[in-house]
């Protein structure tokens, strides 16, 4: 890629990765057909599709519509080689226990951003009556009599554990009460999807969710909402280049914390006919401190992308990472481009205002890779981001996405489906 001045143009934001994946896991609960419209064609979705196919699910694509026929599940084992590259594979724990009353699944993988233990998932399944055994590299679960509703209070708010408990609760006998739930928009979208499938759920969007097993599950057609992190990435790329862009099909309510920081830096935006119109020409103010927090706080997935923007802003800014301990590993790569960042524990001090210069850098995880693209678009000269496959896990054709906004960018090898 090459810095080419301010980004300008309009893009339609893709469907949400973090909403689509749990919906795909939920599809196996029902002995029927599930159709997802606006489903992103990205590497993580393709990997989840391959896992479902290995279980016996028939799938078909038409543009951005994914059809999943789950009438016949032939297999309840998912080997480690299919799960170690994607964290969301653990969501099949709750849905497969609900459907088949047993599962054998390899430990999930994903981005190397820090410890993400599955103990909260396993404890929730145990409280619902499943017998869980952990062997080297595998989790084995059984519930011969089926799952039972339970009162589960999560020790810490966890998106994945909340999703797994919701999936298990769809078929569990009686009522299930979840407390200290994650409140991310993707949790809310999953609840609405499960309601469409037939589950009775109350408390959507709160930290306390009540649900009762579905009397009967039914076929579902559902539209995946837009991806708030992709929208935030485009917005912050415009901020880094002082551009003016329009983002179609976004919900600003899901982006409040991201937009608040954007405004503090001097950016302006408005909603007009369902389109977010952003003018970043006035970006010039550092931010005193931004701390990543569970929703509705500032998302950890946007932290490294914000860091890339702050390097272009004169003055000193601070970021505190409270979620994952390895989310500052991008600093070494940004320094190759001339960025000045000092890290102490969970705190990073960004000394911004110097012109970044193009360099060969290496993506180590999804959002850090996207941040390097944002930095490269604001840099002088040409930049090369190695291991772009990390970026393609969450961004559909990133070269086309940023190309529509005037960026000079290309990918040498691309994930296709």
Segments predicted by a language model, with ranges:
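Short, structured segments at the rim of ligand-binding sites
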Residues: 1-417
């Amino acid at each position: 890629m090459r810095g080419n001045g301010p980004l300008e143009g309009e893009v339609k934001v893709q469907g949400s990765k973090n909403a689509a994946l749990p919906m795909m896991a939920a599809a196996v609960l029902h002995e029927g057909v599930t159709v997802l419209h606006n489903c992103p064609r990205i590497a993580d979705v393709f990997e989840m599709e391959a896992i479902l196919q290995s279980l016996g699910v028939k799938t078909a694509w038409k543009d951005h519509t994914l059809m999943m026929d789950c009438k016949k599940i032939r297999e309840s084992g998912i080997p480690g080689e299919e799960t170690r590259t994607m964290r969301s594979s653990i969501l099949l724990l709750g849905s497969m226990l609900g459907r088949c009353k047993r599962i054998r699944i390899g430990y999930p993988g994903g981005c190397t951003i820090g410890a993400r233990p599955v103990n909260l998932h396993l404890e929730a399944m145990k409280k619902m009556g499943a017998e869980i055994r952990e062997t080297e590299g595998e989790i084995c679960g059984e519930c011969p009599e089926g799952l039972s509703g339970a009162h589960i209070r999560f020790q810490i708010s966890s998106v994945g554990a909340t999703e797994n408990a919701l999936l298990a609760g769809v078929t569990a006998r009686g009522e299930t009460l979840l407390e200290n739930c994650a409140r991310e928009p993707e949790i809310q979208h999953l609840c609405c999807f499960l309601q469409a499938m037939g589950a009775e759920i109350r408390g959507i969007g709160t930290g306390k969710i009540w649900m009762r097993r579905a009397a009967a599950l039914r076929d579902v057609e559902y539209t995946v909402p837009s991806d708030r992190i992709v929208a935030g990435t485009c917005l912050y790329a415009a901020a880094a280049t002082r551009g003016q862009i329009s983002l179609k099909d976004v919900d600003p309510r899901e982006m409040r914390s991201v937009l608040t920081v954007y405004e503090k830096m001097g950016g302006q935006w408005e909603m007009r006919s369902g389109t977010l119109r952003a003018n970043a020409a006035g970006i010039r103010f550092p931010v005193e401190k931004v701390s990543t927090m569970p929703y509705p706080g500032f998302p950890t997935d946007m932290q490294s992308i914000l860091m890339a923007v702050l390097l272009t802003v004169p003055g000193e800014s601070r970021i505190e990472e409270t979620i994952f301990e390895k989310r500052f590993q991008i600093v070494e790569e940004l320094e190759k481009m001339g960025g000045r960042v000092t890290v102490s524990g969970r705190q990073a001090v960004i000394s911004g205002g110097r012109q970044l210069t193009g360099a060969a850098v290496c993506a180590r995880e999804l959002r850090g890779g996207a941040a390097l693209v944002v930095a490269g678009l604001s840099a002088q000269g040409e930049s090369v981001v190695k291991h772009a496959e990390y970026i393609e896990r969450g961004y559909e054709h990133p070269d086309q996405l940023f190309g529509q906004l005037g960026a000079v960018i290309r990918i040498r090898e691309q994930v296709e489906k």
